[in-house]
Curated annotation (Swiss-Prot):
Pathway: Amino-acid degradation; L-arginine degradation via AST pathway; L-glutamate and succinate from L-arginine: step 2/5. GO terms for molecular function: N-succinylarginine dihydrolase activity. The lineage of its organism: Bacteria, Pseudomonadati, Pseudomonadota, Gammaproteobacteria, Enterobacterales. InterPro entries: AstB_sf, SuccinylArg_d-Hdrlase_AstB. Belongs to the succinylarginine dihydrolase family. The gene is astB. Keywords: Arginine metabolism, Hydrolase. Homodimer. This is N-succinylarginine dihydrolase. One of its GO terms (biological process) is arginine catabolic process to succinate.
Length: 448
């Protein structure tokens, strides 16, 4: 067995973090629509989580935000003139498009890509397939820049492969690692990859109220692209009833780490059959199923109990990283303390205040992309993105300089916000040694 570790790459909240309520099916996003946001606080909350976990011995890195508002797409939609004129026209004629191209949703990097560690792949490389995020227009814009960022971070082509997103069609809707779990023993051992989908062609079992964003066809294609050993793959359908209750990704109802699957009793279709399959194929497999009598699906969604991070310590014990909302819900907090006392590897609860992200429907797990790496692979990652004291202080200073502490829907049309964002990303891409990863850098900001 090779030594390997899980490295969490967290998305840095973007400068246009706002509450536009764009995510139908994500009830927190809809509920907080048009509230005033605080991008600077959002960025600091995310950075504090990264630094705390890094200090606790969990390898941690950062993925930068995308350029927003994203002017090239507005030009594709027929708005012309200088960048300032484009902003003015879209704000006056079609403000909904301005909201869409200003979303800071790339911060939820659990949707950036699906990862396959080298120990699981046929060619022995670490593979990642960028998610097309086809179901939501504003998220479907992310794939090209996500690909550029991942190639700048994982730039050793002998060790890493980055695959472009699947074609942008509904049949191949792919939401990345948020619908993917890996189960097994030590990180350096081969694992069982669990791909979770919401719908498939020819199957009438699907939600009726909210969309199922992930298709089985997409999951199968991603497994092929990532060259996952076919003996190490399971495809499972998420329970359509919980999708209709606001569980838009599997990471809102389940989280795995090594041999443990922590999930709600109603997370999967044919759940008992799936768990029996995992017990047969994963040595030491342990399912921690939360009964609906103790935590309802509604409470799981409102607190993001399962949108948590389950992290392994060297001694085999695990820490559960939770949003503040879990501690503030009496029933959920009572259950969690019972969980601590029970016979399972979870020995610590770690709570973070992530309210700015939570109000848009993204908890601790949404903000991170986990990547299993050997020591040699970790050394091959762009070192400038690895979290440490120096980077933490530099990013906090950078955020204080460029991020606003108040942002409303109307502010998105401010040309100064666009200029601030581009200057900030120029500085950040130098700080993180990324090269020219943003379209405005390659086009000189262009006025069309």
């Amino acid at each position: 067995m090779r030594n390997a570790w899980e490295v969490n790459f967290d998305g840095l909240v973007g400068l246009t973090h706002n509450y536009a309520g764009l995510l139908f099916g994500n009830e927190a996003s809809t509920r907080h629509r048009f509230q005033v946001s605080n991008p600077r606080l959002a960025a600091k909350q995310g950075l504090l989580k990264m630094k705390n976990l890094a200090d606790a011995g969990f390898p941690q890195a950062v993925i930068p935000p995308h350029e927003r508002p994203f002017i090239p797409v507005l030009r594709q939609l027929g708005f012309s003139g200088s960048d300032e004129q484009v902003l003015e026209k879209v704000a006056r004629q079609a403000p909904h498009w301005l909201s869409s191209v200003s979303s800071a949703s790339p911060m939820w990097v659990a949707n950036a890509a699906t990862i396959a560690p080298s120990v699981d792949t046929l060619d022995g490389k670490v593979h990642r397939t960028v998610a097309n995020l086809n179901n939501k227009f504003h998220r479907s814009l992310e794939a090209p820049v996500t690909e550029s960022l991942l190639k700048a971070i994982f730039n050793d082509e002998e060790k890493f492969s980055v695959h472009s997103a699947l074609p942008q069609v509904a049949l191949l809707g792919d939401e990345g690692a948020a619908n993917h779990n890996r189960l097994g023993g030590h990180y350096g051992e081969p694992g069982m990859q669990l791909f979770v989908y919401g719908r498939e062609k020819g199957n009438d079992t699907r939600p009726s109220r909210y969309p199922a964003r992930q298709t089985r066809e997409a999951s199968e294609a991603v497994a092929r692209l990532n060259q996952v050993n076919p003996q190490q793959v399971i495809f499972a359908q998420q329970n359509p009833d919980v999708i209709d209750q606001g569980v838009f990704h599997n990471d809102v109802i389940a989280v795995s780490n090594r041999q443990v699957l922590f999930c709600h009793q109603q997370a999967f279709a044919r759940q008992s059959q799936l768990l029996a399959n995992l017990r047969a194929r994963v040595n030491g497999f342990m399912a921690i199923e939360v009964p609906a009598t103790q935590v309802s699906v509604s409470d799981a969604v409102s607190t993001y109990l399962f949108n948590s991070q389950l992290l392994s310590r060297d001694d085999g014990s695990m820490m559960l990283v939770l949003p503040q909302e879990c501690r503030e819900h009496a029933g959920v907090w009572c259950y969690l303390n019972e969980l601590l006392a029970a016979d399972n590897p979870i020995s610590e609860l770690k709570v973070f205040d992530l309210r700015e992200s939570m109000a848009n429907g993204g908890g601790p797990a949404c903000l991170r992309l986990r990547v299993v790496l050997t020591e040699e692979e970790r050394r091959a990652v762009n070192p400038a993105v690895m979290m440490n004291d120096t980077l933490f202080n530099a990013l906090n200073d950078w955020g204080d300089r460029y991020y606003r502490d108040r942002l409303t829907d109307a502010d998105l049309a401010d040309p100064q916000l666009l200029r601030e964002g581009r200057e900030a990303l120029d500085v950040l891409s130098q700080l993180l040694n990324l090269g020219s990863v943003y379209p405005f850098q390659r086009e000189g900001g262009g006025n069309g």
